């Protein structure tokens, strides 16, 4: 199974992630978010995506919870309230299909510390591919990858031709996380 954890995003991925970060920032400002990650995700596939699962290392979702679905070509948002010590650290998995109708999954993980420092920066980690890859997730492995992740990243699974790109930035009292779930074709 071939896959690529890429260092640089395509222009389209960067544009999409920047738009989602801006949406998250606007939402965070509107609700006066504190010590949280405001997450905005866009579905750039050709079918609706459904929420499969989440994992919280620190903090929890607030408000209406995780979006149950993300219709094609639309975005959805949620707020993950951090705890006072470690901030917001969590992950979500959404299921959908690739261009061939094969079941696929997209994973987004983020770390938005309470106090961002050079040694404790905001981070994201992403993964995608065949749905079976996400049947049993080692959350310890995901956390280890997140702990060394960058502030922006993207991933392409060449077997399923799926992609995911994400970025996180500090916005005063909260972090804005943007992600684009897509196809490489």
Swiss-Prot record:
Listed InterPro entries: Jasmonate-induced_protein (IPR053085), Nakanori (IPR049065)
Record field: transmembrane: none
Family listed: Belongs to the jasmonate-induced protein family.
Cited PANTHER family: JASMONATE-INDUCED PROTEIN HOMOLOG (PTHR36482:SF6), OSJNBA0024J22.15 PROTEIN (PTHR36482)
Protein name: Jasmonate-induced protein homolog
Organism: Atriplex canescens (Fourwing saltbush)
């Amino acid at each position: 199974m071939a896959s690529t954890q890429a260092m640089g995003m395509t222009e389209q991925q960067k544009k999409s992630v920047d738009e989602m970060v801006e949406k998250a920032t606007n939402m965070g400002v509107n609700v006066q978010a504190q010590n949280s990650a405001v997450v905005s995700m866009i579905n750039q596939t050709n079918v609706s995506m459904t929420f499969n699962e989440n994992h919280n290392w620190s903090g929890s979702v607030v408000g209406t919870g995780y979006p149950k679905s993300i219709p094609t070509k639309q975005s959805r948002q949620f707020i993950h309230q951090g705890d006072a010590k470690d901030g917001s650290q969590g992950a979500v998995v959404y299921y959908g299909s690739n261009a061939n109708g094969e079941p696929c999954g997209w994973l987004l993980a983020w770390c938005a510390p309470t106090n961002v420092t050079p040694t404790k920066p905001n981070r994201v980690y992403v993964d995608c591919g065949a749905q079976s890859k996400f049947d049993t997730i080692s959350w310890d492995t995901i956390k280890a990858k997140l702990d060394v992740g960058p502030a922006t990243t993207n991933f392409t699974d060449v077997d399923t031709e799926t992609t995911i790109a994400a970025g996180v930035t500090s916005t005063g009292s909260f972090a804005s996380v943007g992600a684009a779930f897509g196809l490489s074709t």
